[in-house]
């Protein structure tokens, strides 16, 4: 009979086959599978077998230690994450060392940056071998910081990548955190720049960008603008200055401006022959009745030109309601689009994420009960979806029409085919990354690398410190 090991809620273990002399694991008998933090996961074929390459930051909040490995794939498995979303993960088999015992376990690979532990030890890996004392921790011994430093010192890497600035307003937003993390994980120096704290020197001989009281921003290779609608004018001015300084931007200022002006964007879509709901725009209240008739009558959608994330969008269910809202908005000098309501969509739409002229991910969004807006910020839900070829073509064409490198393209399914709703130049990452499990932030960083012709240096094979 095998002697069982008693462990606490967290323990240090090692995975020698991966070159991990020590990694802290969360012990969770409530989880069936074990998982390991991994990123830059790339599948490939070797001797007609499926393999993956991946990288690991074994120490929480320390990205200077990077280990790269290649492993054969056992399978791909659906695993329900903490948000209740099922992710498809690669599964590998590795030898686990826990205390003085060792045995093979299966590990699923996923990005655990948002979680407190780089590894989770689930019940399938412990059955018949481990007893868990949930009130204890480090039952098999703890490690001091200096011990960890000695173990991982040979594996620390200096950042020799690009210097990339994220131009935004709040570094704590999910999308911004993910972009900063993704850049660091690929070996780049990431810097957050608050839009409002940047200011410029306009000089044809020596244009400059200053930040927070006089610091001159120099040697930046690329900028990712993530500009809030409320600061579009200033944010685009700052982005243009970076462009004037010869710095690559992931979405230039003019395409961002086009995407923020719903009327201009719609006119560009029409010019490029892209299918969209019938839309009307007028200035005088005398034209209200004909404007409503123009788009097929009520019910219809009313959109403020300056709205975003579902704000400033109203469903007018009757002719009288539509007239009242339109005339009220005109009396306030608010610019308003009137748009055909696509009833057969049933409160659903598609969000296609486009990077570098390709749809890299897509979700179907469903409106919350009692609402017609499917935006996740308005309480809608999302799930991964396989889009049709004509939907993929429409998303890519819309992005090109505006000149964007990265975009979230909203499409609605109708009886006459896919219709283009809107293109977002700063698409949120949380909903779509959670629903699909795809590292979209990493793909955005890779697009910067592609634009600049930067080739990532292969990391050396890991060595276990003695």
Swiss-Prot record:
Residues annotated as binding Mn(2+) 1: 410, 422
ATP-grasp domain mapped to chain residues: 266-449
A single MF term (Gene Ontology): metal ion binding
Class of enzymatic activity (EC top level): ligase
Gene3D superfamilies named among the record's database cross-references: 3.40.50.20, Acid Proteases (2.40.70.10), ATP-grasp fold, A domain (3.30.1490.20), ATP-grasp fold, B domain (3.30.470.20)
Cofactor note: Binds 2 magnesium or manganese ions per subunit.
Residues given in the record as ATP binding sites: 303, 340-341, 349, 373-375
Keyword Nucleotide-binding on entry: yes
Binding site for Mn(2+) 2: 422, 424
Ranges for region Unknown: 1-161
Cofactor(s) needed: Mg(2+); Mn(2+)
GO biological processes: protein modification process; SOS response; translation
Keywords (A to Z) from UniProt: ATP-binding, Ligase, Magnesium, Manganese, Metal-binding, Nucleotide-binding, Protein biosynthesis
Keyword Isomerase attached: no
EC number, as in UniProt: 6.3.2.-
Superkingdom in the source lineage: Bacteria
Residues at which Mg(2+) 1 binds: 410, 422
Sequence segments annotated as region (Alpha-L-glutamate ligase): 162-466
Family (UniProt): In the C-terminal section; belongs to the RimK family.
Name of the protein this chain belongs to: Probable alpha-L-glutamate ligase
Gene (UniProt): rimK
């Amino acid at each position: 009979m095998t002697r069982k090991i008693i462990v606490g809620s967290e323990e240090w273990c090692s995975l020698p086959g991966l070159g991990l002399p020590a990694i802290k694991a969360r012990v969770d008998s409530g989880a069936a599978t074990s998982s390991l933090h991994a990123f830059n996961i790339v599948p490939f074929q070797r001797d007609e077998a499926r393999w993956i390459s991946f990288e690991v930051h074994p120490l929480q909040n320390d990205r200077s230690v990077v280990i790269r490995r290649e492993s054969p794939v056992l399978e791909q498995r659906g695993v329900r994450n903490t948000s209740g979303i099922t992710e498809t993960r690669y599964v590998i088999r590795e030898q686990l060392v826990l205390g003085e015992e060792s045995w093979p376990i299966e590990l699923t690979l996923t990005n655990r940056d948002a979680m407190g532990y780089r590894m989770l030890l689930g019940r399938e890996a412990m059955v018949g071998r481990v007893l868990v004392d949930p009130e204890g921790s480090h039952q098999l011994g703890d490690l001091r910081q200096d011990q960890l430093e000695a173990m991982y010192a040979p594996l620390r890497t200096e950042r020799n990548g690009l210097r990339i600035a994220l131009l935004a307003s709040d570094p704590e937003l999910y999308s911004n955190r993910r972009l900063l993390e993704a850049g660091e994980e690929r070996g780049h120096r990431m810097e957050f720049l608050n839009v409002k704290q940047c200011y410029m020197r306009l000089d044809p001989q020596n244009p400059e960008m200053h930040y927070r009281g006089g610091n001159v921003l120099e040697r930046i290779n690329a900028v990712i603008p993530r500009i809030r609608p409320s600061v579009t004018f200033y944010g685009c001015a700052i982005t243009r200055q970076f462009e004037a300084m010869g710095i690559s931007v992931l979405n230039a200022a003019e395409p961002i401006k086009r995407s923020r002006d719903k009327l201009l964007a719609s006119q560009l879509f029409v010019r490029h022959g892209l299918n969209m709901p019938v839309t009307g725009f007028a200035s005088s209240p005398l034209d209200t009745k004909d404007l409503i008739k123009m788009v097929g009558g009520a019910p219809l959608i009313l959109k403020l030109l300056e709205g975003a994330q579902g704000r400033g969008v109203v469903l007018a269910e009757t002719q009288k309601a539509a007239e009242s809202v339109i005339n009220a908005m005109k009396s306030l000098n608010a610019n308003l689009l009137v748009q055909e309501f696509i009833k057969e969509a049933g409160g659903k739409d598609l969000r296609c994420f486009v990077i570098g002229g390709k749809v890299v991910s897509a979700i179907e969004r469903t409106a919350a009960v009692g609402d017609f807006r499917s935006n996740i910020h308005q309480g809608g839900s999302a799930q991964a979806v396989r889009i049709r070829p004509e939907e993929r073509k429409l998303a890519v064409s819309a992005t090109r029409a505006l000149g964007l490198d990265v975009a979230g393209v909203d499409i609605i399914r109708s009886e006459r085919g896919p219709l283009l709703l809107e293109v977002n130049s700063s698409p949120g990452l949380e909903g779509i990354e959670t629903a699909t499990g795809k590292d979209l932030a990493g793909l955005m960083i890779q697009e910067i690398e592609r634009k600049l012709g930067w080739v990532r240096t292969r990391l050396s094979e890991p060595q276990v410190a003695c």
